[in-house]
Amino acid sequence: MTPWFLYLIRTADNKLYTGITTDVERRYQQHQSGKGAKALRGKGELTLAFSAPVGDRSLALRAEYRVKQLTKRQKERLVAEGAVFAELLSSLQTPEIKSD
């Protein structure tokens, strides 16, 4: 199974873009060359602010959705403190209890 990664890219105007991929370096180069997400085209210099392995594609999609719901301040904290992401990932891996 190929591991998936969650990454955040910082634009020249200090915005954070969130995405998932199986190859962070390849995807970052695509964004840099203008062949990635339209949201990043024409945004000036891009820097990879954060990346972390998340497991399978399903978990990566859930993590991406959760991070996109965070405020800018919360995303900045995630970038600065790895423990914040570990907590978020742990909360996504906890199985939900279903009642009958």
Swiss-Prot record:
InterPro entries given for it?
GIY-YIG_endonuc, GIY-YIG_endonuc_sf, UPF0213_domain, UPF0213_GIY-YIG_endonuc
Indicate the transmembrane segments per the record.
Answer: none
Q: Which SUPFAM superfamilies does this entry report, sorted A to Z? A: GIY-YIG endonuclease
Q: Which domain of life is it from?
A: Bacteria
The record's listing under Pfam families reads: GIY-YIG
Q: What is the residue range of the signal peptide feature?
A: none
Which CDD domains is this protein grouped with? Answer: GIY-YIG_UPF0213 (cd10456)
GIY-YIG domain spans which residues? 2-77
Family of the protein in this entry: Belongs to the UPF0213 family.
Name of the protein described by the UniProt record = UPF0213 protein YhbQ
